[in-house]
Design a protein with these regions (language model features):
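Negatively charged, low-complexity tracts enriched in Asp/Glu with abundant Ser/Thr
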Residues: 1-29, 59-68
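Amphipathic, interaction-prone secondary-structure segments
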Residues: 18-47
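Intrinsically disordered, low-complexity regulatory segments enriched in Ser/Thr/Pro
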Residues: 39-65
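Catalytic cores of nucleic-acid endonucleases
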Residues: 71-73
């Protein structure tokens, strides 16, 4: 079973491998940027992902609560 902390680390590792820049904002959010794309992942403590938003050119595109969808966004 994967814990939330492992999930957060797993997303951070994947983002790094794929060339994304990661910034931690307020200890609760991870912001990934690559070119004009930004992904913001909000965490409820370190226990679970609250949700994530995808932006292109600072325009909101999509929202999810599914870590697998965030992985797909990072792989684009």
């Amino acid at each position: 079973m994967t814990t939330a902390t492992d999930e957060r680390s797993s997303l951070a590792d994947l983002g790094g491998e794929l060339g994304w820049t990661r910034r931690v904002s307020n200890e609760r959010a991870d912001v990934y940027t690559k070119g004009t794309v930004r992904i913001r992942v909000i965490w409820a403590g370190d226990e679970q992902m609250s949700g994530s938003s995808l932006f292109h050119d600072e325009m909101y595109e999509s929202y999810t609560r599914d870590p697998n969808t965030v992985r797909a966004w990072l792989r684009r």
